[in-house]
């Protein structure tokens, strides 16, 4: 599986997207990532593992606590892919808008 495929797969889950959102503000413990979702630590760790496998999150055990933080490189690949298609669709919508404007002008 490519890095991009793994990233999209990991981001397909709303809980993992919320964890990514939380990690935007800085590193967090597994416990802090689990709390808003009322899930067990093992459940949160499974989500973090998917994010790690996709390269989106890194972690480190400090004492008895596991800390997590974002790795921006795979997110940049996702953003680049999305922006490519955003430009394409914006162009298509602009063409459609011009076509509709011309069609209305011919009817009147």
Locations of regions flagged by a protein language model:
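Well-ordered beta-strand positions
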Residues: 12, 58-60
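Short, Lys/Arg-rich nucleic-acid/phosphate-binding segment
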Residues: 61-67
């Amino acid at each position: 599986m490519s890095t991009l495929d793994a990233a999209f797969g990991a981001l397909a889950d709303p809980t993992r997207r919320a964890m990514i959102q939380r990690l935007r503000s800085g590193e967090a413990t597994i416990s802090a990532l689990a709390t808003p979702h009322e899930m067990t630590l093992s459940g949160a760790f499974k989500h973090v593992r998917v994010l790690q496998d996709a390269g989106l999150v890194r972690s480190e055990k400090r004492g008895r606590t596991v800390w997590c933080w974002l790795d921006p490189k795979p997110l940049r690949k996702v953003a680049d892919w999305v922006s490519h298609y955003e430009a394409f669709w914006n162009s298509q919508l602009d063409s459609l808008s011009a076509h509709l404007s011309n069609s209305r002008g011919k009817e009147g």
